[in-house]
Amino acid sequence: KCNPAGGTVGGCRGVDRRHWISECKAKQSYVRALTMDSDKIVG
């Protein structure tokens, strides 16, 4: 079930590859937004 090419990367899991990709992208964008906001506040 876990494929090195597109299995569980970064702790992202999904029913299928499409759902898995969408979940990963959503999480990455959310984390990036938080990091950008924190950088702006600090800087």
UniProtKB/Swiss-Prot annotation:
Taxonomic superkingdom: Eukaryota
Pfam family, one: NGF
SMART domains given in the database record: NGF
GO biological processes: cell surface receptor protein tyrosine kinase signaling pathway; modulation of chemical synaptic transmission; negative regulation of neuron apoptotic process; nerve development; nerve growth factor signaling pathway; neuron projection morphogenesis; oogenesis
GO molecular function: growth factor activity; nerve growth factor receptor binding
PROSITE patterns in the cross-refs: NGF_1 (PS00248), NGF_2 (PS50270)
GO cellular component, one term: axon
Keywords: Developmental protein, Differentiation, Growth factor, Oogenesis
Similarity remark: Belongs to the NGF-beta family.
Functional description taken from the UniProt entry: NT-4 could play a role in oogenesis and/or early embryogenesis. NT-4 interacts with the low affinity NGF receptor and elicits neurite outgrowth from explanted dorsal root ganglia with no and lower activity in sympathetic and nodose ganglia, respectively.
Record-given protein name: Neurotrophin-4
Biological source species: Macrovipera lebetinus
GN (gene name): NTF4
